[in-house]
Regions:
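Short glycine-rich, Thr/Ser-proximal phosphate-binding strand/loop in the N-terminal lobe
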Residues: 2-40, 44, 73-74
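Short beta-strand segments
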Residues: 6, 60-64
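Feature marks short, surface-exposed loop/turn motifs that line or immediately flank catalytic pockets
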Residues: 11, 65-69
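Short coil-to-beta-strand
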Residues: 17-18, 59-61
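Short glycine/proline-enriched coil/turn segments at helix->beta-strand junctions
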Residues: 19-20, 51-56, 94-97
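N-terminal, well-ordered alpha-helical segments
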Residues: 40-47, 86, 90
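Phosphate/pyrophosphate-binding loops at sites that engage ATP/ADP/AMP, CoA/4′-phosphopantetheine
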Residues: 42-59
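Glycine-rich phosphate-binding loop and adjoining helix at the ATP-binding site
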Residues: 58, 68-97
Length: 97
């Protein structure tokens, strides 16, 4: 079982997948236009789902743009200026330790 997030320009969609790949939960919320708020929302949703399921789960996040291997920053994120030049991956790893 795992939790996945799809961060877009207008929404954050969360899903819980069973080990078989079967979807057991899906929810869509508005995406805030501020980096720290996006991180906070994902952490909050994850905690809510883990409490509901009574277990800690792996979390995956996809978002527009690419990670620069040289800098670790996000670049080329169309319509998502609030995550441009941010260290999304490093920040998430700190939140989920």
């Amino acid at each position: 079982m795992q939790i996945g997030f799809d961060v877009g320009a207008t929404k954050i969609e969360s899903v819980v997948l069973e080990d078989t790949g079967q979807e057991s939960f899906r929810e869509r919320t508005d995406c805030p236009k501020e980096y720290d708020s996006i991180i906070s929302n994902i952490v909050e949703i994850t905690k809510k789902l883990e409490t509901k399921l009574n277990k800690s789960l792996p979390v995956g996040v996809c978002h527009p743009g690419v990670h620069s291997p040289q800098t670790g920053l996000i670049k080329n994120a169309p319509n998502c200026y609030w995550i441009e030049k941010k260290t999304f991956s490093k920040r998430f790893k700190r939140c989920f330790r």
